[in-house]
Amino acid sequence: MILLPEICGDLLGDVADEIESVFSAVGGLADELGALLAAVLSARREPVREDLVVLRPLIAGLLQSHRSLVKGAGAIFTPGVLADAPRWIEWWWWRTSSAPEALRVNLDPEAPDHYDYLSAEWYRIPASTGTRHVTGPYVDYACTNEYAVTLSLPVLLDGRAVAVAGSDLIVSGLEERVLPRMCKLARPLALINAQGRVVLSSSPDWTPGMLHPSAQSVRSEIQAACACASPLPWVPVGF
């Protein structure tokens, strides 16, 4: 395995710009939510789920603007922020082609099918670090049942993370954009993340989600290359 960070720009190109645009839209959603919560609290009342209705056109606009790449978007709340829901996910996704639907999962910690978003990387890292994060690829069992990459960032109020705003990209949408460029090159290539997990590959031997066995031996080099990459912390490798 050979690290090829120098060709990342050629492979991603306008795709990186599109993903940065999605990140910007998620940031806009986070700003709107932060302003909404601040306004409600300044009126000396606690926020409730009904207050979030005003965010739905913004979420729908994000989904429509990047429809072939973005499968879901919304906000996930820190426990106790909403007065009428100990935990809450205001998340909308393309279940069918007609219109976005609200995601419904069981948020009761005592339930056997409890969806524990607090432990999810896409929530936990932005909430604890105060910085944006890219998670994946992983199989999104809670929503799409497809390989996804989640872009997320914290919603901060007085320095505290009160929610996380995010968006799910489907890996198949990334493949449509990037694989044709990969296949034009002379050698098989893959994009891998800092953990050595394959995001995209032009080789049938390496599919999204697989851990490359050679990654462990050069993990520090992979992590350094991914840390320098933006907006996606991935690095191309050749076989």
Regions found by a protein language model. Give the residues of each.
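Soluble sensory domains of the PAS superfamily and closely related sensory modules
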Residues: 66-68, 118-133, 220-232
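Extracellular/periplasmic ligand-sensing ectodomains of membrane signal-transduction proteins
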Residues: 68-129, 200-202
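Extracellular/periplasmic juxtamembrane segments that couple receptor/chemosensory ectodomains to their
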Residues: 205-239
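Solvent-exposed, extracytoplasmic
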Residues: 169-199
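Short, basic/aromatic recognition patches
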Residues: 118-143, 171-182
